[in-house]
UniProtKB/Swiss-Prot annotation:
Protein name as it appears in the record: Pentatricopeptide repeat-containing protein At1g02060, chloroplastic
Keyword DNA damage set for record: no
Keywords annotated in UniProt: Chloroplast, Plastid, Repeat, Transit peptide
Location(s), subcellular: Plastid, Chloroplast
Residue range of the transit peptide in the UniProt record, numbered on this chain: 1-21
First and last residues of every PPR repeat: 137-171, 172-202, 208-242, 243-277, 280-314, 315-351, 352-386, 387-421, 429-459, 463-497, 498-532, 533-567
């Protein structure tokens, strides 16, 4: 409805109108443009694109053309890329001439939203959309190359780069920097080498500081620190001076490679150079961490004091890094000195949660649980909030010492305070809570364990073993529905339960009469590439039939036949009967035919008896004919009942067809329905059929007379 869209006034004027003279934009004009952009975006965001929406958009701002600023602001405010593109085309159709900036903005919008195919098509339509006024240039390709890289599609980035060159568009240093970063993040160091050579030798593009920082960081992250160091040394050849980021990157790479002495020399070289580049807190902290990783704590302490002597103020990361190294070396007295020294007028370091976590872990690792608990209590005394790491270390240690009561107290506190849902940077580890999950699930407290587990899931933490522990716990406690819900969650996260978990859950669901859930679990089991034993199929089918779930029973029988699962004649008969009783005779006959085609039988007498009792005589007629087709014996009394019933309901043709079939097979002699059939045919005026029956009756009388004479 037009009325549902915010009323807008005439947005565009004729192209024939004179162009307004450029004037200084006032704050009031800016406010008007922003307000108009918000109104346009609000209309687009809150309504599906339609002729009504376009009509309403066209009714804004009479006698004034829309400004370039308004178009750009509107594009930035539109939420859905497809709507943004429609708006882009719509203003163009109304006479607005897009320039380079709006094309670039639209391309960035599509790329950020991962609409990459649309973005690619848009890129190659720029010249057409602008009537040749806007030419393809490297910045457009750079945008889409970055978008492909952010989506993890590095090969598409490379292909687009090749296309760019084939079209005669020279890559810029920004193009090469983007592609180098993408390749190195994917570990394609060889391709990055080749690209760097192509950059210099083929295109003559001079690397800048960002290029070298990208290469050095990429090679360091790919454990190629020697190559990174060589690139670092080559910077002077290109008159490109390393900045502090460059130095810090190479120092970090060397430290991670265990070459801490060389990293120290690099830092010392920074100090000796008469440049504006000096080591900062990151430089020293990285070196401290490097020495701590090699357990050269004395050297780490010396670097720390050297940092202080040069007037650099350590930050929390510096202190925590050194404290971690000292605690792992069990040099606790020196930690006190560091903390005391960190409270002078210069440094003013206040221990944070990370500091206490380091100390707690160190004490736990050393087997000093009481000391760890004291540190934890001191943390609370200082009004600091323990995070997931604080609790997980203590809970795991208590479980290892079989002190489950104390562990459970902390576990409950963890849940009640919603520690796992906190915004701390420390991502919880599910494995740390597994011992507690196992204990609770083994002691009838699975619900308590699941509460914490669901908090972990909300933080994006996944752990397949925990799912099994909880599902098993619920099953052990007879709570099969919660177990089923966890299994569904597990599969949604693309984790596959094991065979034992599936079988345990199906068995439990059947025990409480949850046939549909058991059937669903069985189907999920099959989709997980497991094939249950025949008894599992039979158990589920029996419960479905018992609960009168006709459609599900039908589906399961057909599935069993498809999977070549052995059939049970009693169950098959029960399912066919259920389908007949549910007015689904087509499915009933289909099942019967499929069973017989696969070499299985049903209890025909039972089915025919049911159909006759319930006056489903046409179905009984069809079923008897099927039996005769398959050469299966049918009780003659049943045939009499079917024929007489059909006659009674004036289904003379069906009654005669069955009689005729019995005659052809020589099975009519024992029939007692001749008179009933003859009378019905006579009343219906079916003389030809009447004559046929009469002849058979005469033949039978003659045969009987001969038998008497003999």
């Amino acid at each position: 409805m037009v009325s549902s869209v915010p009323k807008l006034h005439a947005l565009f004027v004729s192209k024939s109108q004179p162009v307004l003279r450029a004037a200084k934009v006032t704050n009031e004009e800016r406010s008007t443009k922003s307000k108009l952009a918000r109104s346009l975006a609000r209309a687009v965001n809150s309504n599906p694109w339609s002729d009504e929406l376009e009509s309403s958009l066209s009714s804004l701002h009479p006698s004034q053309t829309i400004s370039r600023t308004t178009v750009l602001q509107t594009l930035r405010l539109i939420k859905v890329p497809a709507d943004g593109l429609r708006f882009f085309d719509w203003v163009s159709n109304k006479g607005f001439s897009h320039k380079e900036q709006s094309f670039f903005l639209m391309l960035e919008f599509l790329g950020r939203a991962r609409n990459l195919n649309v973005a690619r098509n848009f890129l190659f339509s720029i010249e057409r959309r602008s009537n040749g006024c806007v030419k393809l240039q490297d910045r457009y390709f750079n945008s889409l190359i970055r978008s492909y890289g952010n989506a993890g599609l590095f090969q598409e980035s490379v292909k687009l780069f090749q296309t760019m060159k084939q079209m005669g568009i020279s890559p810029s240093v920004l193009t090469f920097n983007s592609l180098l970063s993408i390749l190195l993040k994917r570990g394609r160091t060889g391709m990055a080498h080749d690209l760097f050579d192509e950059m210099r030798r083929t295109y003559g593009v001079t690397p800048d500081s960002y290029t070298f920082n990208t290469l050095i960081n990429g090679f360091c992250k790919n454990s190629m620190v020697d190559e990174a160091f060589r690139i670092f040394k080559d910077m002077e050849l290109y008159h490109c001076n390393p900045d502090v980021v460059t130095y810090n990157t190479i120092i970090d790479g060397l430290c991670r490679a265990g070459k801490v002495k060389i990293a120290h020399n690099v830092l010392s070289g920074m100090l000796k150079k008469a440049t504006d580049v000096h080591p900062n807190v990151v430089s020293y902290t990285t070196l401290v961490r490097g020495y701590c990783m090699k357990q050269e704590i004395d050297e780490a302490v010396l670097v720390f004091h050297d940092m202080l002597s040069r007037g650099l103020k350590p930050n929390a990361v510096t202190y925590n890094t050194l404290i971690k190294g000292l605690s792992e070396a069990h040099r606790y007295d020196e930690i006190k000195d560091i903390l005391i020294g960190g409270n002078d007028a210069f440094t003013t370091f206040a221990p944070d949660a990370c500091t206490f976590n380091i100390l707690i872990k160190a004490h736990c690792d050393a087997g000093h649980l009481d000391a760890a608990m004291k540190v934890f209590q001191e943390m609370l005394n200082m009004k600091l909030h323990p995070d997931s790491a604080s609790y997980s270390v203590l809970i795991r240690t208590l479980c290892m010492r079989n002190e489950f009561d104390r562990a459970e107290t902390l576990f409950n506190e963890l849940f009640e305070k919603e520690v796992l849902l906190g915004k701390d940077e420390c991502k919880p580890l599910a494995a740390a809570y597994n011992p507690m999950f196992e204990y609770l699930c083994a002691n009838g407290k699975t619900k308590q364990a699941e509460k914490v587990f669901r908090q972990l899931m909300k933080r994006g933490v996944q752990d397949p073993p925990s799912y099994k522990t909880l599902i098993t716990g619920h099953c052990r406690e007879g709570k099969f529905k919660p177990a089923y819900e966890l299994l569904v969650l597990m599969l949604r996260r693309e984790f596959v339960p094991d065979l034992e978990t599936y079988e345990l859950l199906i068995d439990g669901l059947l025990k409480i009469g949850e046939a549909l859930l058991a059937h669903d679990t069985l189907q999920r089991m099959l989709r997980s590439s497991y094939l249950p034993v025949a008894t599992t199929f039979h158990s589920v089918l029996a419960e479905l039939a018992k609960r009168k779930f006709a459609n599900e029973s039908f589906c399961l029988v057909t599935l069993m036949l498809e999977k070549r699962i052995r059939q049970n004649i009693d169950l098959s008969t029960q399912v066919v009967r259920l389908l007949f009783s549910s007015a689904q005779k087509e499915k009933a006959f289909l099942i019967v035919r499929l069973l017989y085609d696969n070499g299985y039988l049903v209890k025909m007498e039972e089915l025919l008896g049911y159909l006759c009792e319930n006056r489903k005589l046409l179905d009984a007629h069809t079923l008897v004919l099927f039996c005769l087709e398959k050469s299966q014996m049918v009780d003659i009394d049943t045939c009499n009942t079917v024929i007489e019933g059909l006659c009674k309901h004036k289904r003379h043709s069906e009654a005669f067809s069955l009689y005729n079939e019995l005659v052809e097979l020589g099975n009519h002699q024992q029939l007692s329905c001749h008179v009933v059939l003859r009378n019905a045919l006579e009343a219906a005026g079916k003389w030809e059929e009447l004559q046929f029956v009469s002849k058979r009756m005469a033949t039978l009388r003659e045969s009987d007379d001969c038998s008497v004479l003999e």
